[in-house]
Amino acid sequence: MRVQYFSDEYISETETVDLIEKVSEKYKDIEGKILYKFPSIKELDKKVIVPDILIASEIMGIIVIVVDAMQVLREAEMDIFKEKIEIIDNYIYTSLMKNRNLKQNARSLKISVTTLGYCPNLSIDLEDENIFCSVSSILEYIDKIDELCTEEVVEEAIASLEQATAMIKPKERILGKEDKNTKAQLLKEIETQIARFDDEQRLSALTLLNGPQRIRGLAGSGKTIILCLKAANLHMIYPEAVVLYTFYTKSLYDYIIQLITRFYMKMTDGQIPDFENKVKVMHAWGGRQVPGVYYNACKNNGISPITFGEAKKHGNAFKYICEKFVDATQYDANKMYDYVLIDEAQDFDISFYQLCRSIVKDDHIIWCYDEVQNIFDVILQNPKETFANKYDPKGIDLIEEQKKYPRMRNDIVLHKSYRNVKKILLVAVALGFGIYNDKLIQALENNKHWEDLGFTVVEGDCSKEERVIIERNEKASPLVVDESRIEDCIRIFQAPDFSQELDWIAKEIEKAITVDKLLPEDIAVICLDETNSFNYFNRLEQRLEAKSIATYNVMDRDYVKGFYREGNVTLSSIFKAKGNEAAMVFVIGCDVFGDKKDSRIMRNKVFTAFTRAKIWLRISGTGEECLKQMLYEMNQLKEHEFKFDFLNKPTHLLDKDWNERSENYDNEQAFYEELLEMSRKKGISVDRILQMYTQKKKEDEKIDE
């Protein structure tokens, strides 16, 4: 039996904890879960009720235990207790009956539901009422339960109670018998697989700690969904609390609103969340037209917001304005929020973390951190350093905070990634780190960091300069797909010219929609060649329009928010694709990779672009052997049976290499800018200067001969 605590109330509820420990010990060899303070129940206009213990297993079914500390058996108190038990029992039963996958027939379930009362301070069992006063009586009753159901049914039951079934439902796909082998049918099966939480996700979403919490994992581990459920849960349990949900990628806004709404409506039987006053979903910056965390914080603290035009004069504009805010308030601003939830936290400078901490009460700050999304940041974040400054040198120490609640976790690692099939994820990581490049570009700092992300270090020490072999843990990539059904998971096209690359992309998109039955919104196109992205998308739109395929270009000037539009293929930059995904992704213009193969920036872009693809990845570029380097590294990965087998280099040495390369690059850029300035002053074009240089070089070579 695995125990999970979702509330820190256990500290004062010793009798309940004692019962949990006794049940856990007696049934330690039985597969199942013991959940403390689960699920939260909200009836219309009534207070939230939470069962104290819920046990779920194949041989016990669902057992709910409600605890009351009454000292004396009084009829009035007992009647109130019985009513509470009845409300919980009815809620559990009706919630499960709403799920067609759990119904045996019109009136019964595939899993039994038993609700018990526990009054440890009384001396008499009320057996007829299933109310007991001792642990031994509870255990004796549980022993008599004779249940037999499947693990699938148990997991489905928990999913129904935790509101995971309110996740975005798989799209309606009209598929006939003749479509059973199409990509659309496979996608439908995969979407069904991931429509519930695993244990780590459940713990992350429903744990309510009185203090800070970090949730981290790979892209696709469900962090945004988890944070949205947490926001909805906080709003339900603490209706007067003001909850801030902030994020980095503007295109996520609609998705976040939709998820919080779905979860909250499911929890409260149809009520709408109060986005106006209590749940504030805001982008980090904001302005006069659009609310934002920084802008609103300034207004609330009597500070004039710094404009973007002014801020960009100081380098990193957003970092600058956040630092100025922290200095202006001396890290002690007005506490505007009861809880602050930060999504995509890896993309923010530490100054934004500090701004958020300064405007929330009691350090109720929860951040979701993608450990490899920002490939520059391969060293594990240290919260003490993240939150420390001259006003508070200590920062936030999660280890010390954890000691207050030893049965709970304030630093949760999500080991599983649901976004990509394993092959795509491994290709993305291999290219992102330069595993099979002639020089390693970056790596994780030690074995534990790899293991936290769902990998197994088969050989070697990742903190040293030595050969290491690393493989993906099967359980960490749970998308179950028959390999024979995704033989074309990754396809690559080297086009002779630009026009033929565009023709191929348009033809493949048309085939995916007409033959493979994918919906247009299942498909996204991301351009790696950002210099030519306008040209790519403009011409691709024309080709697709000729095939009656609509497009949604999130790079258009009039774009506001959202990544998907029903009936449209999405065209996106890498930046706006972050945090989003599509079943089939075309990463185009990849010929720019070869010349920048030693650049961390380019490797980061490739990793981000590739990991947007859930099942099918299409890669293209223009020019003969334009993808030679990329193909070489991918083939090396395949030859090594999709394991990482490489000479490791400690992260501090890799950083030194990168800094030296960056310095050389900066010198080259400075020279180039000087050359441009000189050409303008002298009235000589750069092309003419290069022509003169080439001619002079040839003349010098002749003299040498």
Feature map (PLM): residue ranges:
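Alpha-helix-centered segments that form part of catalytic cores
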Residues: 179-192, 315-327, 470-497
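Conserved P-loop NTPase-based nucleic-acid remodeling module centered on helicase motor cores
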Residues: 57-97, 110, 126-136, 260-332, ...
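Surface-exposed acidic, glycine-flexible loop patches that form ligand/cofactor-binding
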Residues: 102-106, 331, 514-518
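Conserved helicase motor core of SF1/SF2 NTP-dependent helicases
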Residues: 214-244, 248-273, 285-288, 339, ...
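Conserved helicase NTPase motor core
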Residues: 181, 185-207, 212-216, 281-284, ...
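Short, flexible/disordered intra-domain loops and linkers
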Residues: 44, 74-83, 292-315, 378-390, ...
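Accessory nucleic-acid engagement/destabilization modules that flank
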Residues: 1-175
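P-loop NTPase Walker
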Residues: 34-67, 151-289, 611
